[in-house]
Amino acid sequence: MLAMLLAFCLCEVSGPLRAQTHGGRTRAPGLASQNLIALQKKADEARDAGRLDEATKLYHRALAINPKWVEGWWSLGTLQYDSDRYAEAELAFEKVVALNPKHGTARAMLGLCEFELGQPDRALKDIQESEKLGVLEDQQLRDVVMYHEGVLLQRAGRFEAAKAALSSLCLGGLRSGELAGTFGMVALRMRDVAPPSSSTEAGRVVQHVGRAACLSGAKEYDAAKTEFERVIAGTPHFPLLHYAYGRMLQDARDHDGAIKEFEAEIAEQPSNVLPRLRIAAAEYKWNPESGLKFAEDAVKLQPELPLGHYLLGLLLLETGAYQRAIPELETARKAFPQETKIDISLANAYSQVGRPQDAARARAEFARKKQVERASGEEAVEITDAMDARSKQ
């Protein structure tokens, strides 16, 4: 579905693209030749008439004469992408980006080519860079790019970021089996390239969970809750199903319901730290004494996990165990050197145990990092996202 959608929207953006290329015929050097202008016009006419093979040959001829014709490289790239000639399309979009580095739409298309060519790291980097630069005001193209970003993040195990990307699609009204399959894998923390077959129990669970997650992403929480409860009634022991439901209930601001589901996941998987970390994080402000046990258990189960030490340090600090909090927070700071909350928490703990010089250094470090954040215009990544790719399933 999304592949067909992309083919459609690429045809639609060829007009507004001229505003982004800044490479029209009158601007490019060496275009005084009337023959070259005529050749470029013929290439565009063949493209618009659907004579794609002819258009491709004409674009190649024109670009051999004028290799700085940005719009020509774009048109050639889209033709080759639509023909599933991704390696050639990649080269064309690389030319566009080289000639106009701020061309966000071409950067997005380059990322889509890299996705098809099995270059996930490069694809994700270019797609995310395209979002910073800006993609043309074409919602269909934006949806395709956002979906592929979600897939790449899911396969990389960056489930929280993938959830945010896919939720934006659901909030915009997009629904499909393809989207549900990917979102189901995100919610159940599966890094598989494709969801299980729909003829299997696992495949059906993934689809149901994906639909529920999409409803939650669209803020239709009652409908999402109904979908989750239906699938849990049928397969209550499916791995991370209760965890996924707990995350949905957190989004719906149902604190008690979320804790109940995380505890149910612990009962199903006693050695899994994820639900313990979620409870510890959720109880930090609500009931730190209750959350403390779950953070302690998480650290015992997986002592190499820095996030466990971070949450344990915060909960110890909140419950007045300042001396015990310090080594936990210091361990976390080594793993998350840019996280300002660790510095201010350590400053508090140092002050409470009579270490004013250490407290002053921690506050100074906090101020320095905040100044860097303001200068860059970017804040540090939310630390609870460190659950992704840092905890054993």
Regions found by a protein language model. Give the residues of each.
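Terminal, low-structured helical/coil segments at or just beyond the last alpha-helical repeat
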Residues: 22-27, 175-214, 351-393
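Alpha-helical segment of the N-proximal tetratricopeptide repeat
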Residues: 34-65, 82, 204-226, 230
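Helix-start (N-cap) detector for alpha-helical repeat units in TPR-like alpha-solenoids
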Residues: 36, 70-71, 104-105, 138-139, ...
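Structural signature of tandem alpha-helical TPR/SEL1-like repeats
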Residues: 48-58, 82-95, 117-129, 142, ...
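Structural marker of alpha-solenoid helical repeat scaffolds
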Residues: 65, 99, 133-137, 172, ...
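Canonical tetratricopeptide repeat
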Residues: 75, 109, 144, 148, ...
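TPR/TPR-like (Sel1-like) alpha-helical repeat modules
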Residues: 115, 128-132, 147-154, 159-177, ...
